[in-house]
Amino acid sequence: MKAVMLTGLRQMELRIVPEPKIKKDTDVLLKIERVGVCGSDVHYYETGRIGSQIVEYPYITGHECAATVKAVGKSVTRVKAGDTVAIDPAVSCYTCTQCKLGRENTCYKLRFLGTPGQ
């Protein structure tokens, strides 16, 4: 598959990379159709970092995406192959106090897809 990768400060390349595979029963394999460029992508391009999040090159950019579901793991029930989805790059823990109160966006352990080191 093709991926746009940061290869150094202010350097990008379109590369061919191995296509991911379903590994867990909860995995969903997506074909990315469109990707937005957000502020964090610009920071990674210009400076190679945001605070303690430092890019290790080469690095695939983009985390705000629209995609088509290609395949799903055995236990996935909410989407199926062929569905169109929008990606929320925020990944909540669902176990902390904030998550239990329904405030997943303020999760104490919030992580973001497409972020170095996460």
Segments the model singles out, each with a brief description of its role:
Residues 22-35, 49-100, 105, 117:
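Glycine-rich beta-strand-centered segment in the early N-terminal region that forms part
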Residues 40-46:
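Cytochrome P450 core scaffold surrounding the K-helix E-X-X-R motif
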Residues 1-2:
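Extreme N-terminal starter segment of soluble prokaryotic enzymes
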Residues 11-15, 39-40:
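Short N-terminal binding/cap micro-motifs at the start of the first secondary-structure element
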